């Protein structure tokens, strides 16, 4: 898979997630955004929300269920805009906003 295909899968994933969850943004991050991907790379996706709901433990499995409809290579995480979170900071700096 190349970067263009990963971006297209991320777009499809964003559309599917948006139908079930109020999201603020979605980023493709990791090896595809840093151009270090290989044939075995997964597709790291950060789903940004305003607030983690009380149903965090329901929202996370939802993201994984939706991924099965798009691609099993997708590895989603759910985050808030917390500049003190190193993962969020890395996603915003190096990720591709979808």
Residue ranges and their predicted role:
Residues 1-25, 33-39, 50-98:
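Catalytic core of pol beta-like nucleotidyltransferases
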